[in-house]
Amino acid sequence: MNPSTAQARVVVDELIRGGVRDVVLCPGSRNAPLAFALHDADRAGRLRLHVRIDERTAGFLAIGLAVAERAPVCVAMTSGTAVANLGPAVVEANYARVPLIVLSANRPYELLGTGANQTFEQLGYFGTQVRANISLGLAPESGASALNFSALNGQWRSATCRVVVAATGARSANAGPVQFDIPLREPLVPDAQEPAVPYAPDGRPDGRPWTYTPPVTFDQPLDIDLTPDTVVIAGHGAGVHPNLAHLPTVAEPTAPAAQTPLHPLALRMIRPEQVIMLGRPTLHRPVSALLADPAVPVFALTTGPRWPDVSGNSQATGTRAVTAGAPAQAWLRRCAEANRHAVDAVRGQLAAHPLTTGLHVAAAVADALRPGDQLVLGASNPVRDIALVGFHTADVKVRSNRGVAGIDGTVSTAIGAALAHERSGGRTVALIGDLTFVHDSSGLLIGPTEPTPRKLTIVVSNDNGGGIFELLEQGDPRFSDVSSRIFGTPHDVDVGALCRAYHVESRQIEVGELAGALDEDFDGMRVLEVKADRSSLRALHASIRANL
């Protein structure tokens, strides 16, 4: 067995022992040893391999798989710009704490700076965005003694375990991306004399990892008196806190569902005396204003070592609350009434509005979801719209790229999440805007030999541009002569034609037909396009606020 083949087989075997179940592979020459080893493992049923031609979409496919599987996922690519194209996914994985492993094949390091083809200083390219930069080191030339090879087997497996531990946060309680750079020398393909059954040097008995690391316990109790009028703000990455479940809770869609829900717009009707912040809230301006109020104490509870504090207003941080006191019943009733009033205001104005908007599409999707479903949301208006229409259920798993909240890679994220969710038999519905869809439309490219979602519906709310800017300062009517072009960015893309190019079923429907369409029995991946209007969004939201 040549050195690069041995090295790749050891790495793949040890990744599987560390909990990797899915790997996304992008084709290339330098990563050929990894490609052969991954294909052999896929054929043996030890992992599931997904081949993609675009490293950028491959990274987000891996994020969707990792988030839904709650397990580390690898992306393997060749050297050069293939590595650089992982940049957006690595940044998202960093801030969303997703265990993404970048398996970057490299030329032998002595070729750096020599002008060798497809070579740059890629080890460490991601800088502070990764939990660790780990190099496997170059395998020795062919002909190394069996004794040396045995020692290298342990070194390679130990390094691979370090990669998995860093990605999963087993010792830090801070999962995230890791770069595992593997320089590979020629030959890059298995020897002609290879046995029919691929062989790898032995690991530990019974499939155990070479170096076992139990998950770290990260526990920081924080005393909180619940006697003051308290609200909970639960954002992305929030943990589950049963002793806070009775408190009025503004829960963003990706947070655990609230047992005592409080609509984000209801904050305009009440005056909390303190806030318990869970995770990292990013969606609603009334929430941001409350968290920035210096007269309102904020207690931050997170599941890892970092905590958000945009306004610098948090008084204390921890991982769980040790509570004393109890909220006044009058306060709980006031919040419940404010929640009902806010939900009614939104739904009432939706019914009265003469045009279909993205908010109408979100309401139709929310009402059509079933227990056991998975919902993937675009990071712009869709995730906000779902929150505004009053969606909150513990029976639906909600995903969205909230790490740095970019729209890039959302189609690929949805496909990855669907492929993972289908292992439990559930279906996935993705709600995204047209810009988000077009931006990552290449994510629809799935080769005929690759795993394909069997229960994925992508709902595209198509208002021909960036509807979110209608609701921001840029959407002020005084900028109407320029805002449509430079912020709205109309594109006139034919969504149906785009889907046909990728052999994906699609059809255009009215919002009133969406519930029936989502209730259909369907096998495969499809796109449902709903035309929407964005010119009236500003007026619709103003009418909702006026009716609070």
Swiss-Prot record:
**Known catalytic reactions:** isochorismate + 2-oxoglutarate + H(+) = 5-enolpyruvoyl-6-hydroxy-2-succinyl-cyclohex-3-ene-1-carboxylate + CO2
UniProt pathway? Quinol/quinone metabolism; 1,4-dihydroxy-2-naphthoate biosynthesis; 1,4-dihydroxy-2-naphthoate from chorismate: step 2/7; Quinol/quinone metabolism; menaquinone biosynthesis
Family matches, as CDD domains: TPP_PYR_MenD, TPP_SHCHC_synthase
User: What's a Pfam family this protein contains?
Assistant: TPP_enzyme_N
Give its E.C. classification number.
2.2.1.9
What are its cofactors? Mg(2+); Mn(2+); thiamine diphosphate
- Any idea which UniProt keywords this protein has? Magnesium, Manganese, Menaquinone biosynthesis, Metal-binding, Thiamine pyrophosphate, Transferase
Q: Which InterPro entries match?
A: MenaQ_synth_MenD (IPR004433), THDP-binding (IPR029061), Thiamin_PyroP_enz_TPP-bd_dom (IPR012001)
Q: Which GO terms describe its molecular function?
A: 2-succinyl-5-enolpyruvyl-6-hydroxy-3-cyclohexene-1-carboxylic-acid synthase activity; magnesium ion binding; manganese ion binding; thiamine pyrophosphate binding
Biological process GO annotation list?
menaquinone biosynthetic process
Q: How is the cofactor bound?
A: Binds 1 thiamine pyrophosphate per subunit.
Q: Which domain of life is it from?
A: Bacteria
- Family annotation (Gene3D superfamilies): 3.40.50.970, TPP-binding domain
Please describe the quaternary structure of this protein. Answer: Homodimer.
| Family label | Belongs to the TPP enzyme family. MenD subfamily.
> What is its biological role?
Catalyzes the thiamine diphosphate-dependent decarboxylation of 2-oxoglutarate and the subsequent addition of the resulting succinic semialdehyde-thiamine pyrophosphate anion to isochorismate to yield 2-succinyl-5-enolpyruvyl-6-hydroxy-3-cyclohexene-1-carboxylate (SEPHCHC).
Against NCBIfam families, the record matches this protein to:
menD (TIGR00173)
Q: In its UniProt entry, what is this protein called?
A: 2-succinyl-5-enolpyruvyl-6-hydroxy-3-cyclohexene-1-carboxylate synthase
